[in-house]
Amino acid sequence: MSHGHSHDGAPCGGHHGDDGAGGSRPSVNDVQALVDQLRLAGVDVSNMPNIPTAPRDMDEARSKSFQFWSTQPVPQMDETVPADVNCAIEENIALDKVRAEPFSLPAGFRWSNVDLSDEEQLNELYNLLTRNYVEDDDSMFRFDYSADFLKWALQVPGFRPEWHCGVRADSNNRLLAFIGAVPQTVRVYDKTVNMVEINFLCVHKNLRSRRVAPVLIREITRRVNVTGIFQAAFTAGIVIPKPVSVCRYYHRSLNPRKLIDVRFSHLSAKMTMARTIKLYKLPEETATRNLREMKSTDVPQVFKLLTTSLKQYSLAPVYNSEEELAHALVPKKGVVYSYVAENQNGKITDFVSFYSLPSTVMGHTTHKTIYAAYLYYYVAGSVTPKQLINDSLILANREKFDVFNALDLMHNEKIFSDLKFGKGDGNLQYYLYNWKCADMKPSQIGLVLQ
């Protein structure tokens, strides 16, 4: 399997040109265009000097200086946090001491909240992300977040409109950059912290030499601080100071012919297409008894089941209300899919969910979209995780997904080989802003960010 295609729901995502060149040198955009042309011509650009690409692994990151992140309250690359340390890096600021006025943008640009309840603005954000958001390293695939997905991810209970933070051009009012934050209580080891999740940092390709991303990060930090929240969680496909955990994507083919056609994956040596299709063929029916789509009336039971299960992990969400959980997990067609199994007494014993995040295929004549399902939260109570996840493969296949993706967090890694998942080439780093604690193994992570 290739193309780990990691989420950069994060400050300094892989294609945002944060710590790149500026001044009179060619812009990051110019250099990136050249890099893309060289890549297309088959040239290995990974060892070329002076090309400002974001580091994709820890070793590469240790040798890099981070102009922006070295100024932020995050552990630095060479820092090892002892096991008994689990606390904020900077003390909370008194609210009357938090900067009251927005940070300055370059001339010709202004701040503008994006109102996702307004169809026109929602579509503007959709178009910005569709054309400028995360691509894989070979520029073959780009995430295609639907408008419904954006509302689901950003309009969570307790969301604040000013945390949907856009930048517009004065000249034509065009939306050119965005960063989003949503409230989320997170438990880190034994401490429960009110945080925000940061997501959808995106800067228009034409603006990437203007160092807008650091200003976006500073501004969303200010807007969050004003409300008395001083910590954040986010993920990124690149390495910046300093991940609390490094997870890896795994992929399970559901439609191998299409995935091979678009070069998401390739035929293994000595394998024919017919044998590959046979290898990945799934049963028609699920194995878990009484497995059905989750309903809103199931929320109280799923709330108890999931809340208990998440206690085993060192980094996990804390649902403060059934309303929060209902928003995240009650099925929404084309966005989130959730299923429960109940016993003879009507007690829910098992639960599994996945969300839909398609990718646009760049420049393919036949296929325009890969339909990808991502494993979300689950609790295997009466059956093994292996059986429950295999059932979710069957359910995703029934919904016509092409591939089923999962990270090696929770207990996932133990079941990947049996269920024919292949290791992806993309890591997903987990980050905490203004918090330091000991590093975590992927199996300690119970927080899944879209």
From Swiss-Prot:
Protein's UniProt keywords contain Cytoplasm: yes
Protein EC: 2.3.1.97
Keyword Acyltransferase assigned to the entry: answer is yes
Where is the protein situated, by its record's location annotation? Cytoplasm
Please give one Gene Ontology molecular function term for this protein: glycylpeptide N-tetradecanoyltransferase activity
GO cellular component, alphabetical, reads: cytosol
The GO annotation for biological process reads: protein localization to membrane
Residue ranges for the region (Disordered) are 1-28
What is its EC class? transferase
Q: Which UniProt keywords apply?
A: Acyltransferase, Cytoplasm, Transferase
- Catalytic activity field: N-terminal glycyl-[protein] + tetradecanoyl-CoA = N-tetradecanoylglycyl-[protein] + CoA + H(+)
> Where is it mostly found?
cytoplasm
Where tetradecanoyl-CoA binds, per the record, is at Q67, F68, W69, F200, L201, C202, V203, S209, R211, V212, A213
Q: What does this protein do?
A: Adds a myristoyl group to the N-terminal glycine residue of certain cellular proteins.
Q: Which family does it belong to?
A: Belongs to the NMT family.
Q: What is this protein called?
A: Probable glycylpeptide N-tetradecanoyltransferase
- Species for this entry: Caenorhabditis elegans
Q: What is the lineage of its organism?
A: Eukaryota, Metazoa, Ecdysozoa, Nematoda, Chromadorea
The coding gene here is nmt-1
